Swiss-Prot record:
The keyword Nuclease does not apply. It is an enzyme of class 3 (hydrolase). It is found in: Cytoplasm. It comes from Sulfurovum sp. (strain NBC37-1). Keywords: Carbohydrate metabolism, Cytoplasm, Hydrolase, Magnesium, Metal-binding. This is Fructose-1,6-bisphosphatase class 1. The lineage of its organism: Bacteria, Pseudomonadati, Campylobacterota, Epsilonproteobacteria, Campylobacterales. Binds 2 magnesium ions per subunit. It catalyses: beta-D-fructose 1,6-bisphosphate + H2O = beta-D-fructose 6-phosphate + phosphate.
Amino acid sequence: MHTIFETIEKVALKIDHAIKTEDLGYSESENSSGEDQLKLDVKSDYLIEEAFKSVSLVKDLISEEKEGVMPLHSNGKYTICYDPLDGSSLADVNLSVGSIFGIYDGEPKGENLVASAYVVYGPRIEIIRAVKGERPKHYRAQDGFFNLVSKEVILKEKGKLNAPGGTQQNWCDYHKSFVDDLFAEGYRLRYSGGMVPDLHQILLKGGGIFSYPGTSDKPHGKLRQLFEVIPFAFIYEQAGGQAIDAKGKRLMELVPAHPHDTSPCFFGSNYEIKALKKAYGVNA
């Protein structure tokens, strides 16, 4: 696992350089979900592919930007599912973006995820990484190396931040009431449109909730299970929080039928998730 994390660190520096120096415009292609690809999406995907080609532990790569599985090493142990540049459309307005990695031992599904990591490309490059049985660890880049900032990232029982995703006019009434009730309690809005920076802020500021519900236009949610939802669910649970879907099911129990399946998702401290379950009428 050390080799995989080390590879993520090395490729993160290359992606950060690309963000700072290369064309931020659109390419002439679409990803597997039919979304227009930015040139940075394509470049970041290429950099990650190239980086893992030499890592014999990795059996397959599955990218959010591609439809199929990329076989690497037939004797490898792990499948890595990744979003090469989450929130890439924010780069041209100079907001933080990120990369997400889920490391699966066996079939890619929640129960087989053994480690995950994400990178934040902002004023500084930071990485949060987690393995089973340990609190997530926080690293920050300096002079080309990643130094440990905190060996235990822990969510408080109750937070102060509220990051509600999805177009509000497409929310159901009980989700809107839930969000409004949090603001009535004094919660602060923190939503950039980037999953990585928003969840990173909640994690490092001690707690709160990030929600991306099913909506009238996207009833199955927008965020992809293998690349985004399950890796972050793992990190939030390891930090002492919870991550569930709209029925109260742990996101770590998801079994995607297709690599690009999506799910409504909610990540937060225990207090906020309990309040969400009450609002959604599911058993705590």
